[in-house]
Amino acid sequence: LGERFCSIQRRHQKILEEGPWLSEEVREELGSKVVAGAEAVGYKGLATFEFLRDSNGDFYFLEVNPRVQVEHTVTEMITGYDLVSIGIRVAAGEGIPINQNDVKIRGHAIQTRINAENPLTLAPSPGRLWECHWPSGPGVRVDSHAHTGYDMPASFDSLLAKVIVWSPTRSDAISRMKAALSETM
């Protein structure tokens, strides 16, 4: 289902994720290796194969996460597939409802995590959200549980929301994300 690129990560959390990133040729080569790896162990379902890429462009296998990840929204935006629904259907024994030849990567998507953190120390910051406004509009998606008046508990993951944008090109997606983040309060 394509690839995502984590451009900023902090404390094992992906802060900024985007896709697609690779050329069609590299995507096909890496994709065939991923499929072969899943087939070799008999895995059927959703998973993220993670790789590190060096300055020469060579990939090194890191790990497989056999689950839907926080940044699955990038893949959903560029493929049009609802990965959570597919994962549930596969787990229920329905099989994978996608033919690999039908998968088309369209446009560019970026996801940004919005965290409840102290802006100076970046430590988690529990407390009340006195005001909360999420962006909206064409090509903008927000996944969140937070709202005005929400009390963020002290024992929590600092994730408040994921702001995801889609546009036909990466430069347009960057502009759309800047606008969406400027709307966020």
Language model feature labels by segment:
Residues L1-M185:
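ATP-dependent carboxylate activation and anion-phosphoryl transfer catalytic cores
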